[in-house]
A protein has these predicted regions:
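Alpha-helical oligomerization segments
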Residues: 193-236
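A generic structural motif
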Residues: 52-59, 94-101, 215-229
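Intrinsically disordered, low-complexity segments enriched in Gly and acidic/Ser/Thr residues
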Residues: 154-186
Length: 236
């Protein structure tokens, strides 16, 4: 006799005060080489009217990074696909090892759930006062999932406290996206560190290395993309 188990499935995002939402923002970074005319790329982005940031790659003098964002994931296989398969983007060489994608998510404590999921990530990456960015994926070890909820909360609060301190000082502003099942290397999260100067972004990574989460429960970090925005979609 077979026994069935009732599994509660809830794919909504949850915030404070019983807020719920089925909306979320997808963000993708694609990195290219052999760019000799950034102006043509900017003109193409303006023509296609996509929400995007174009970065100059710090570690490749002919490299660029294209960060795009949309609520509807079909955007990436329609509008964006057509864009990168047309001139001038199709003339570039793509660095697939740096392709990163993730979706906004909630922790259950957000006071303004819609702002957290949809608007804050856009505001952060499109702010002209914060042109510097470090993007990287990470994967936790299985041991983290086996911790009790109380232990997990303690580990995550340590990271959160550091992140808020850097943000309050206007040193670094973070974007945290989930990429379970979306990342080609089976990473769990995609992190963006955004700010007005590069050094504080590097410094927060250094500081995080000392935390329990990074020192004990991270299986892999990177690759790291370091870029400086040369064009951002104007904020609305």
């Amino acid at each position: 006799m077979s026994q069935t188990t009732d599994i509660q499935t809830d794919v909504q995002e949850h915030g404070a005060n019983q807020q719920t939402s089925n909306r979320r923002l997808y963000m993708q970074l694609q990195v290219f080489g052999h760019c000799t005319d950034i102006g043509r790329l900017i003109a193409s982005l303006q023509q296609h009217q996509v929400q995007a940031v174009l970065y100059q790659d710090v570690n490749d003098p002919r490299g660029v990074g294209l960060l795009t964002m949309h609520e509807e994931p079909t955007f990436f296989v329609t509008t964006l696909r057509n864009l990168v398969n047309s001139d001038p983007f199709r003339e570039l060489s793509q660095k697939l090892e740096f392709t990163m994608i993730g979706r906004s998510y909630s922790s259950g404590y957000e006071s303004d759930l819609e702002d957290w999921l949809l608007h804050r990530p856009r505001r952060t990456v499109l702010n002209p006062a914060w042109p510097w960015a470090i993007w990287y994926p990470l994967r936790r070890t299985g041991a983290f999932a086996k911790l009790s909820p109380q232990e997990q909360g303690s580990v995550l609060r340590e990271h959160g406290t550091i992140g808020r301190a850097y943000g309050d000082a206007d040193f670094a502003h973070d974007i945290r996206l989930a990429c379970h099942g979306l990342d080609s290397h089976d990473n769990d999260f995609l992190i963006g560190l955004i700010g007005k100067e590069l050094f504080p972004l590097s410094h927060v990574v250094q500081t995080m290395r000392k935390t329990r989460q990074t020192s004990e429960f991270i299986q892999s970090l990177g690759p790291f993309f370091v870029g400086h925005a040369c064009w951002q979609t104007p904020s609305r």
